[in-house]
């Protein structure tokens, strides 16, 4: 569930180990459920640095692995892999010891999903808005201590334990998978306050994220794009009369340079040795089309750009287009109070204007 828009003071509440908890509540493994529960409890205890409790679980089997607590995170991750693997087996398409043949529609995931629907309605009945729900988390804008406590108490009724991990001071939700947010409060790491969290390729692009949000220095790697195809990629120089002779020698009879199924490229200015980045058609090998996201620009392998010291020939217009596109997404949801300038900051807004000039 997603309600795209810009919001403030958005509490992020996550269920701790939702699917494993659902397995417990359903008693899915009968007499063996308790053993599974111990693994889950041990993982949560380690995650919360309650090592004394973790040492007593699973018959004390983990105690010797916690003598060096610096290895605790690795142990927690190992337990997480085991837990998630068991959950995956409960809904696998093949027979196995963890799958009940009556479980034809993933009862574990269904219990969690139905709970989140119930929670959404319950929060709305309290007079609060719900703007984003994922598998095991809910986001509530303008959240108060009372509504946070309500969510946690509601979870207990169904056997779930919520954790209030962070609150976003600013939150722009584009769709159910893409958002950008500034952290206003964090439960475990105060240094994260004021930093930006992004999801989705558009806002996670390093150039866009740094330019609009984090303001870290732009580095060479930020101006490189990794492209992959299932067939083959070529740099095509057809019709380009300004191709340097050094590059022309590497071309085939069709004025193309084979670069493989994957590669790292930079957009470069006309005349800098770049070509059109094309992918070969899967069925018609004589047919080519622009690799996704590369149309209208010339491209050169990033290694070549660096070797020939052509960094100053990187085409900034490509990155301006990326920034402008991200800005346009944010502006879709702004208003007189929650303006674009307010969201990204007045200084950043001015830099974007300079970029477009």
Which stretches of residues belong to each language-model region?
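Hydrophobic, Leu/Ile/Phe/Ala-enriched alpha-helical segments that form helix-helix packing faces
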Residues: 43, 119-123, 150-158
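Glycine-rich, histidine-containing beta strand-loop boundary motifs that form or position
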Residues: 15, 22, 132-135, 164-166
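Helical catalytic core of nucleic-acid polymerases
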Residues: 1-118, 124-126, 141
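Composition- and surface-driven signal marking solvent-exposed, interaction-prone regions
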Residues: 23-27, 134-135, 150-152
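Beta-rich nucleic-acid/ligand-interaction surfaces
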Residues: 137-145
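C-terminal, non-catalytic extensions of nucleic-acid polymerases
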Residues: 76, 80, 113, 145-357
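Glycine- and acidic
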Residues: 1-7, 48, 52, 57-70, ...
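Glycine-centered loop/turn motif at secondary-structure junctions
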Residues: 127-129, 158-159
